[in-house]
């Protein structure tokens, strides 16, 4: 199946359920992206055998966003801050009074929840890349070396860690275009095939018209 996806993001668990459903029904799953497929949309796209993108298409960082108090924050940033303060406390024996007040209001459950949210996205991406996207990756592009299962796992971990690294992208809403991603994973460029590009752009236009000019809702 060729699955056209366009979403600003959503639930990682929903992405997992959709991926499982598609894999039960279809032997090969390809994702087509002409708009944005951010956050959970990126996680889902990485479960595909192939990713096809236009120049207008974009993926995004997959660092989990968690609710802490009244704010939604990056799980990666939150964990990094906690780790930084832990090291500071063990090194100097004390904390800045303001930091101490903030930390005193954080429960162990919140910390574990943040860590689990972050690792959940990584686990999905690492598993799916090895099983599907890297399934036919047998020879390296530059050195022409045979690809081992360990090499696939190492590469999958690198991709997952990088996409989860909020410090790398600075904002969860960052748009990652084909040129940003080609060194990371292989993405097929739709615009290189004029006939295919015309079909995909028509689909994109029709869907936008349906969503904006009718009573149809995206759930």
Stretch-by-stretch model annotation:
Residues 1-30, 52-54, 65-219:
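N-terminal organellar transit peptides
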Residues 24, 29-64:
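A generic, well-ordered mixed alpha/beta core segment in the N-terminal half of proteins
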């Amino acid at each position: 199946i060729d699955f056209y996806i366009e979403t600003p993001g959503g639930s990682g668990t929903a992405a997992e359920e959709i991926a499982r459903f598609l894999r039960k029904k279809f032997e090969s799953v390809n994702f087509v992206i002409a708009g944005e497929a951010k956050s959970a949309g990126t996680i889902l796209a990485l479960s595909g055998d192939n990713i096809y993108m236009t120049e207008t298409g974009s993926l995004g960082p997959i660092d989990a966003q968690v609710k802490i108090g009244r704010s939604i924050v990056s799980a990666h940033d939150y964990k990094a801050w906690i780790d930084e303060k832990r090291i500071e406390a063990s090194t100097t024996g004390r904390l800045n009074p303001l930091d101490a007040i903030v930390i005193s209001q954080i429960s162990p459950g919140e910390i574990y929840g943040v860590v689990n949210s972050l690792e959940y996205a990584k686990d999905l991406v690492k598993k799916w890349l090895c099983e599907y996207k890297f399934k036919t990756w047998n020879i390296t592009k530059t050195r022409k070396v045979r690809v081992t299962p360990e090499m696939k796992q190492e590469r999958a971990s690198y991709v997952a860690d990088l996409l989860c690294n909020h410090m790398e992208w600075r904002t969860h809403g960052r748009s990652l275009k084909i040129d940003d991603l080609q060194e990371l994973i292989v993405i097929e460029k739709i615009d290189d095939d004029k006939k295919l590009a015309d079909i995909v752009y028509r689909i994109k236009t029709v869907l936008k018209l349906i969503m904006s000019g009718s009573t149809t809702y995206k759930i």
